[in-house]
């Protein structure tokens, strides 16, 4: 199966103290990730504080990372919104950028469309680009989710709708997707670091990861071990990552991971409101988990 890679990091974005985008530091983070276990990057996703970024800043960051880092791995641009018209317009702009390998498109949030509305939303986007599309299913943030049957219909009509970041937390959904879309031309990625190993067992090919900012090599090694039939080694790595994964989600993402990135020396910069630094107790918890992990 040709995939975007095993470990795709949903990367943080670096901002200056005044809240403006720091492209140089963001590119440095991207290079670090690709040199330390990541096969590709998701740029300007939730972890990258996409809601607080302007369209112009997103386009500038997509362009810079594709140009400076695209030779090292897959570059996937997050382009989704809950308005179909503006999503289509943005997709057309992003599709013109050299070096973008795929698009991440979330199920429309807050307005909670039914399955027909979701189908028509993704249909309009698919007709606006030839780039591979990864659907992002995350009911906990969106308020609803795409059904495997809707996804299968989209893929049958638009083969470049060819991947999903599956973050429902329900292994049966991933299993049903693989049943309805058999073969190697559709990629299922875990959208939850802690469920990556069990997701592999029902047909996933990798993970869109947050913890890979600090544990990218181990995440990649775990997937490679599973693929090679070394299940006990994969389980050992999975268990060794449990505490650091838990620490990355003790409060809302990307608060823990951006704090952790600073602690390991990455130029992560400040948060843009409404995101803010972790509490003292949360920071202490993350510090302990990092110290234990790097031993």
PLM feature segments, named:
Residues 53-56, 89, 115-117, 146-148, ...:
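Short secondary-structure transition/capping segments
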Residues 19, 60-61, 168-169, 195-196, ...:
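Hydrophobic side chains within alpha-helical segments
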Residues 24, 50-53, 85, 168, ...:
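Basic, gly/Ser/Thr/Pro-rich low-complexity segments located predominantly at protein N termini
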Residues 67-73, 97-99, 129-131, 156-160, ...:
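Short helix-capping segments at alpha-helix termini
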Residues 7-13, 32, 36-38, 93, ...:
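C-terminal alpha-helical cap/extension of soluble enzyme domains
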Residues 2-9, 14-143:
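Active-site beta->alpha loop and helix N-cap motifs at the rims of alpha/beta catalytic domains
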Residues 127-128, 141-249:
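Catalytic alpha/beta core domains of metabolic enzymes, predominantly
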Residues 26, 58, 62, 87, ...:
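A general structural signal for well-ordered alpha-helical segments in protein cores
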């Amino acid at each position: 199966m040709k995939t975007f890679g095993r470990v795709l990091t949903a990367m943080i974005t670096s901002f200056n103290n005044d809240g403006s985008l720091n492209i140089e530091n963001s590119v440095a983070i991207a290079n670090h990730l690709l040199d330390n276990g990541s096969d590709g990057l998701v740029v300007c996703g939730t972890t990258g504080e996409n809601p607080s970024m302007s369209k112009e800043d997103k386009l500038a960051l997509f362009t810079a990372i594709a140009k400076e880092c695209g030779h090292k791995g897959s570059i996937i641009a997050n382009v989704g919104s809950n308005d179909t018209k503006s999503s289509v317009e943005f997709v057309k702009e992003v599709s013109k950028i050299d070096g973008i390998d795929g698009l991440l498109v979330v199920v429309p949030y807050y307005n909670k469309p039914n399955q027909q509305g979701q189908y028509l939303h993704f249909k309009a986007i698919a007709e606006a680009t030839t780039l591979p599309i990864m659907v992002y299913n995350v009911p906990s943030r969106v308020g609803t989710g795409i059904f495997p049957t809707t996804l299968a219909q989209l893929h049958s009509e638009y083969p470049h709708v060819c991947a999903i970041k599956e973050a429902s937390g329900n292994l049966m959904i991933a299993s049903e997707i693989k049943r309805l879309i058999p073969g190697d031309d559709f990629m299922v990625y875990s959208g939850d670091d802690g469920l990556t190993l069990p997701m592999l067992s029902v047909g996933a090919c990798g993970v869109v990861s947050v913890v890979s900012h600090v544990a990218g090599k181990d995440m990649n090694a775990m997937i490679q071990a599973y693929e090679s039939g070394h299940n006990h080694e994969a389980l050992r790595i999975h268990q060794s990552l449990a505490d650091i994964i838990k620490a990355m989600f003790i409060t809302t993402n990307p608060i823990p991971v951006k704090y952790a990135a600073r602690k390991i020396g990455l130029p992560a910069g400040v948060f843009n409101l409404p995101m803010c630094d972790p509490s003292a107790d949360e920071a202490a918890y993350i510090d302990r988990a990092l110290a234990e992990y790097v031993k």
